Amino acid sequence: MQYSSLLSVVLFLPLIGALYAGLFGAKAKALHVGVFNSLCVLVSFVGAVVLFIQAWHHQSYEKYLFDWIVVGNFKVGFSLMLDNINAVMIVVVTLVSFLVHVYSIGYMEHDAGFNRYFSYLSGFVFSMLVLVLSDNFLGLFIGWEGVGLCSYLLIGFWYHKTSANNASIEAFVMNRITDLGMLMGIILIFWNFGTLQYKEVFSMLNNADYSMLFYISVFLFIGAMGKSAQFPMHTWLANAMEGPTPVSALIHAATMVTAGVYLVIRANPLYSAVFEVGYFIACLGAFVALFGASMALVNKDLKRIVAYSTLSQLGYMFVAAGLGAYAIALFHLFTHAFFKSLLFLGSGNVMHAMEDNLDITKMGALYKPMRITAIFMIIGSVALCGIYPFAGYFSKDKILEAAFGMHHHILWFMLLIGAIFTAFYSFRLIMLVFFAPKQHAINHPHEAQNFMLLSMLPLGVLAVIAGFFEEPFFHFISQVIPSVEEYLVPLALLISITTIAVLLSIAYAIFKYKNGITSKKEGGFLYKLLLNQYYIPKLYQEIAKVFSTIASFLHQVVELKIIDAIVDTIGRSVFVIGRVFRISQDGNLTSMLRFMVAGVLILLAFVAFFGR
């Protein structure tokens, strides 16, 4: 088999799994559906590793499948490509997806929608692979929309729950709004360059109008803001926790929310040419890093805390990408995928043991009955905090170093505060769930099944060792992404400041919550502000109410009393006129002769008057 053909294998195997599971969607749980889908993604992962090795040896591939759209001079083919950027992405996507599939076999074993779930899950993986393997913007957009559709189906998987329905609709609508911006960017690209192929577009940037590049980069980033839940399009991310927990692991670690970061990295020649937009992305990312972390400080929902940490970490990635450190952004995406999926799967174990209760203040003393899960979640939390030698240390510190080295000291300080917040809420969660006094009434909390724990093991290992791939990773990526200039920074001092601040934050969280929540100060203004997400969802609700009121007025007054009244009047007028003229068609010979004579007289009068 040619290696270019392997691209098709990697891409279409998850689709085959999705279609296979769909055949049994309305039937009772069939274990073979979960096993078959897991094997499909496993083979896809093996193929991705083979392709990664080829890319490592300076091989790049293109696979033209068929003409997709041909209209005049406009031609778009369904074609795939492999370079160093998406070689990393497909390995991350398929590895995390395979482990989530295996974990899901146990997690969803008692769910009536088992088969349907795997159909959606594999479809999700396929859509993400379309997004990252496409060699043009339109193909990327199709994968982009596929990811949005599958996320809607998975977030609202338990459609009998009103909260799940609302969350899925919110995610879908919010992403459709921002996707319109991305579509505008793609239209402008074709309008100005006459092509949507990455290579052709990027090769013509030097001769393009700067203002047009500015608009294109802004519109594309609007799309990224929706998928990666950047402020103010962030509210759907926490509500997406209504879906099954393994879905959260996939959305937050390897697929949907990383798509926006991937887009900026993929379009790095464009954003390097428009530095104002890049700087805005970095500033917004720093704000979101702090913003997301602050909301996690007080939240009591286990999954939402981890979700807010994703929001915060995406901010770090966008800071790196916005400052032109695209390789560092991709490296943090790479390491983050492992410890974030580990945290979500661990949360799923805890949720099952607690009989679906997610309030961390009503847990406690779970370390002994769930020792392995506790160890995995501690590993994930330490990696998230960025403590040496765990993976997060290498990637997050690189972002802080880049911000400081480029003299963006305010951004660096915001990221430092975000790191301190991250350490605090991470170990607040760990202490309240595993080590604080028992606050629940579950008699025998149990550990997850062995094969579910085994599926978490590779993630736990990678959360520890992935950072040590730093040097070969940057060497590999620098072949296609410009390297960041080396800056003279007091590296030892920066690392010391960050590490000491994070360790002090961890120590404070351990000390504060070792006996559970004892403080009664959780009713203050700041607490309520953070717990209610700065009241932004309520603001959106009020805005929606205004439009709902306007729509109601238009319906009740304009449509019913004006438009409908006009239409009804016209209808009644026609009916009345019809009744008047109906007598001419009553079949009475005398009446018909009268009308005939009247018609002749009218015609004669008309001719006499106008015929002169």
Write out the residue ranges for each language-model feature.
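Membrane-interfacial helical/loop segments at transmembrane boundaries in membrane proteins
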Residues: 61-75, 199-205, 398-402, 472-489
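Membrane-entry segments of alpha-helical transmembrane domains in multi-pass membrane proteins
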Residues: 1-12, 28-35, 75-92, 130-143, ...
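Hydrophobic alpha-helical membrane-embedded segments
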Residues: 49, 340, 420-427, 499-521
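Hydrophobic core of alpha-helical transmembrane segments in multi-pass integral membrane proteins
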Residues: 41-52, 98, 186, 496-510
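Transmembrane helix-loop-helix hairpins at membrane boundaries of multipass inner-membrane proteins
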Residues: 1-8, 20-119, 192-210, 214, ...
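Aromatic-capped, Gly/Pro-kinked transmembrane alpha-helices
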Residues: 477-490, 517-612
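Hydrophobic transmembrane alpha-helices and their helix-loop junctions in integral membrane proteins
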Residues: 94-140, 149-451, 456, 462, ...
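Hard-cation-handling environments
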Residues: 445-508
